[in-house]
């Protein structure tokens, strides 16, 4: 049982409703519920009910109006966080590179004009890709001088964070600790690891979730108290939303930062809950529509001419099936005609050292496309950045000129040096999260994002229309190219003529003509 007499207990990152019985407040329960189409039922999201203790956990970011309206004003405010360790001697090696980083750091530390943030326990840092969220987070850690835990959405990103911490500060390897696996957490809780010198902990969502599943969320609370964590930071905070809520419900640290370039959820109903959970959490977004865009958007509209049977085959009980469509398209003639046009564009407009990232929805479709490119363009290096390649070899694939991938594999936080062009060739989506994520892969100026749209499917036309307003905001310019079958064939004819012209120019060179004549005479002599 809890030691709080009040009905409502407010902590740094959660509001707990004590002595709650399911059904006591249908308004709140519905506000934090989504409909499961597969099982035809409402399921809770963004809240947690402890049936044994009869405690209902809600996000601290929910508007207090809803709490008071639903449960009254018998509120106990927990004044301080759990005990945390102070760290000293952290020195920064670099100053902020621009005004945006300076502004973001002021926001995080509660400096003018953000004085209120000094007392805020939760802050959203919604900075666009390339601004430097990593640097801002590390500077914040250094200034606050509290033991910090970074929680990443992928195990792969932990090493990146470790390297950046060492690059930006004077921390040594032995002052940064990676929590890996359930056994590692058990050792920390049981005091089998001396953490007195550790200043920065790194852990993944999957590790914490696995530990909680085995030992319970109260043990996650015990872990944070044992480590005396003062600050926790979520990287790519739009991912693992359910896990973020649970960690927030069962930890009570001084400061929590949510880093993301896309503070939204793909699903409409999930996003409604996400926005409710962070409604009162201060946020910063320094995107400047006039100065920040650096990539142009080009949409190429074509028609794969699906028959009624094709449209039916690319559907499931819920509607359009993206996986089935992706594989269907690789059997269509116009797909390879469009690919031919794109390959010529790559050869003519991408620099010799530049790279091209191509999104394709499935590994099967990737392989069909890969073999086509290798057959017709054997001189071009092509990499596979997906589950087709062993994890330890994936990074090497990014050294190729053309990289075939999926949105799942080339997700958030991926930085490809020298990327000049992104092509969404055969992976349909309407998600604003994926749109910003894929668009953010190109970091340099004068880069391009090409979106291939099959207008033969009404669903894909709807996807395209729903994303256009966002592209108008984040791109330097937007160009729409409509390609009829006649246009495609004419373009291919022009390409063929140009290839013949170049071949003729090569053959007309004097030294080459001499070699040909000698070869012909040698053949006649035999």
Indicate residue ranges for each PLM-predicted region:
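Conserved helix-turn-beta segment of the N-terminal RecA-like "Helicase ATP-binding" lobe
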Residues: 157-183, 377
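Conserved two-lobed SF2 helicase motor
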Residues: 195-214, 397-412
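Walker A/P-loop
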Residues: 116-140
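Conserved RecA-like P-loop NTPase helicase motor core
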Residues: 387-470
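A conserved SF2-helicase RecA2
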Residues: 278, 282-288, 444-505
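Conserved Walker A/P-loop ATP-binding site and its immediately adjacent core
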Residues: 143-168, 362-366
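Conserved interdomain linker/interface between the two RecA-like ATPase lobes of SF2 helicase motors
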Residues: 283-356
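Post-DEXD/H (motif II) to motif III coupling segment of the RecA-like Helicase ATP-binding lobe
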Residues: 231, 236-297
């Amino acid at each position: 049982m809890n030691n709080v007499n009040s009905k409502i207990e407010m902590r740094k990152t959660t509001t707990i409703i004590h002595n709650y019985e399911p059904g006591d407040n249908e308004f709140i329960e519905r506000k934090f519920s989504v409909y499961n189409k597969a099982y035809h039922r409402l399921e809770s999201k963004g809240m947690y009910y402890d049936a044994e203790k009869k405690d209902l956990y809600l996000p601290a970011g929910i508007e207090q109006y809803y709490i008071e309206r639903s449960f009254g004003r018998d509120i106990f405010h927990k004044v301080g966080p759990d005990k945390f360790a102070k760290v000293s001697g952290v020195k920064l090696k670099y100053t902020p590179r621009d005004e945006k980083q300076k502004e973001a750091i002021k926001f995080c530390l509660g400096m003018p004009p953000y004085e209120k943030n000094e007392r805020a326990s939760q802050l959203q840092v919604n900075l666009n890709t390339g601004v430097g969220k990593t640097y801002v987070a590390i500077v914040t850690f250094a200034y606050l001088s509290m033991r910090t835990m970074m929680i990443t959405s992928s195990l792969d990103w932990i090493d990146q964070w470790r390297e950046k911490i060492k690059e930006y500060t004077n921390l040594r390897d032995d002052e940064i600790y990676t929590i890996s696996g359930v056994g590692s957490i058990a050792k920390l809780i049981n005091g089998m690891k001396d953490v007195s010198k550790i200043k920065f902990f790194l852990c993944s969502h999957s590790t914490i979730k696995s530990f909680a599943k085995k030992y319970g969320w109260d043990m996650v609370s015990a872990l944070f108290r044992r480590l005396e964590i003062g600050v926790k930071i979520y990287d790519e905070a739009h991912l693992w939303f359910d896990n973020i809520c649970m960690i927030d419900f069962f930890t009570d640290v001084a400061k929590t930062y949510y880093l993301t370039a896309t503070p939204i959820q793909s699903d409409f109903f999930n996003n409604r809950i996400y926005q409710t959970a962070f409604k009162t959490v201060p946020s910063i977004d320094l995107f400047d529509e006039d100065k920040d865009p650096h990539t142009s958007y080009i949409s190429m509209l074509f028609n794969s001419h699906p028959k009624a049977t094709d449209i039916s085959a690319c559907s499931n009980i819920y509607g359009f099936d993206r996986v089935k469509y992706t594989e269907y398209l690789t059997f269509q003639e116009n797909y390879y005609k469009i690919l031919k046009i794109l390959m010529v564009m790559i050869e003519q407009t991408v620099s010799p050292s530049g790279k091209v990232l191509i999104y394709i929805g499935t590994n099967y479709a990737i392989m069909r496309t890969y073999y086509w490119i290798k057959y017709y363009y054997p001189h071009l290096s092509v990499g596979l950045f997906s589950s087709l390649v062993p994890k330890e070899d994936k990074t090497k694939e990014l050294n190729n000129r053309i990289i075939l991938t999926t949105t799942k594999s080339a997700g958030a936080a991926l930085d490809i040096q020298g990327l000049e062009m992104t092509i969404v060739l055969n992976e349909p989506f309407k998600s604003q999260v994926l749109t910003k994520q894929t668009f953010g892969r190109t970091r340099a100026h004068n880069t391009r994002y090409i979106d291939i749209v099959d207008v033969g499917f009404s669903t894909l036309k709807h996807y395209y229309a729903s994303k256009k307003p966002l592209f108008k905001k984040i791109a330097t310019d937007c160009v729409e190219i409509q390609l009829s079958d006649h246009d495609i064939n004419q373009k291919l004819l022009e390409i063929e003529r140009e290839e013949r012209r170049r071949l003729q120019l090569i053959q007309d060179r004097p030294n080459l003509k001499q070699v040909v004549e000698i070869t012909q005479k040698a053949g006649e002599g035999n």
